[in-house]
Curated annotation (Swiss-Prot):
This is Thymidylate synthase. GO terms for cellular component: cytosol. It catalyses: dUMP + (6R)-5,10-methylene-5,6,7,8-tetrahydrofolate = 7,8-dihydrofolate + dTMP. It holds the Pfam family Thymidylat_synt. Homodimer. It comes from Aeromonas salmonicida (strain A449). The lineage of its organism: Bacteria, Pseudomonadati, Pseudomonadota, Gammaproteobacteria, Aeromonadales. The keyword Methyltransferase applies.
Length: 264
């Protein structure tokens, strides 16, 4: 994951100091892309320990179409707590848009199921896209989608995925986002009887928060270690039937974790 450290250094060297919605302040770049060959290892940051439990359970929560934090709390995952209301509700965030996008005619669109169907039956389509950026419902969401739009691409028996992330907290959020969409690509490939290709991450406002600078310096002082491998222990009947126990990360040997405050 040298490319991740390179991005951090590029922000420090070339970024612009900006204000932001949270009032914290950032150093920011606009427009950056990284590519990960998923056959060469699972792209999980090794220069600090990442909380795998949160990454996996959050993705399963998205795929279930859930928008209440109750399931996450049951699994010991607190990453959405700061944005939830007193009942744990978040409004129509990712899970709602992925699984039940409201159409103008009153229909509900399951974008994930449609993507699976297109990959299987129309793999050359240039429209295998899932969007969480529903302009008509942004005001109802506790947090507007940061990882907003992703597209699948099939070539030579391999499935690739590209994510567009409009806003990216590089220190805290980006390692989660890369791992989450890499995991989703593996799952979709398995369901569609394909090998994995590349995960391409494209960022818009790519930033380091001003209160993450010491943590960033510590991480930049560390040498990346070999990437782990992902093992999926079974093939469920559908993309929606995976369980936490189905996944194992092999050979993950990270440096110690680094704590940092979340900008709310």
């Amino acid at each position: 994951m040298r490319v991740y450290l390179d991005l951090m250094q590029k922000i420090l060297d070339e970024g612009t100091v900006k204000s932001d919605r949270t009032g914290t302040g950032t150093v920011s770049l606009f427009g950056h892309q990284m590519r990960f060959n998923l056959a060469q290892g699972f792209p999980l940051v090794t220069t600090k320990k990442c909380h795998l439990r949160s990454i996996i359970h959050e993705l399963l929560w998205f795929l279930n179409g859930d928008t209440n934090t109750a399931y996450l709390k049951e699994q010991g995952v607190s990453i959405w707590d700061e944005w939830a209301d007193e009942n744990g509700d978040l409004g129509p965030v990712y899970g709602a848009q992925w699984r039940s996008w409201p159409a103008a005619d009153g229909a509900v669109i399951d974008q994930i199921q449609r993507a699976v169907d297109d990959i299987k039956h129309n793999p050359d389509s240039r429209r295998i896209i899932v969007s969480a950026w529903n302009v008509g419902e942004l005001d109802k969401m506790a947090l507007a989608p940061c990882h907003a739009f992703f597209q699948f691409y099939v070539a030579d028996g391999k499935l690739s995925c590209q994510l567009y992330q409009r806003s990216c907290d590089v220190f805290l959020g980006l390692p989660f986002n890369i791992a989450s969409y890499a995991l989703l690509t593996h799952m979709m490939a398995q369901q569609c009887d394909l090998e994995v290709g590349d995960f391409v991450w494209t960022g818009g406002d790519v930033h380091l928060y001003s209160n993450h600078m010491e943590q960033t310096a510590l991480q930049l002082s560390r040498e990346p270690r070999p990437l782990p491998q992902l093992a999926i222990k079974r093939k469920p009947d559908s993309i929606f039937d995976y369980r936490f126990e189905d996944f194992e990360i092999l050979g993950y040997d990270p440096h110690p974790g680094i704590k940092a405050p979340v900008a709310i």
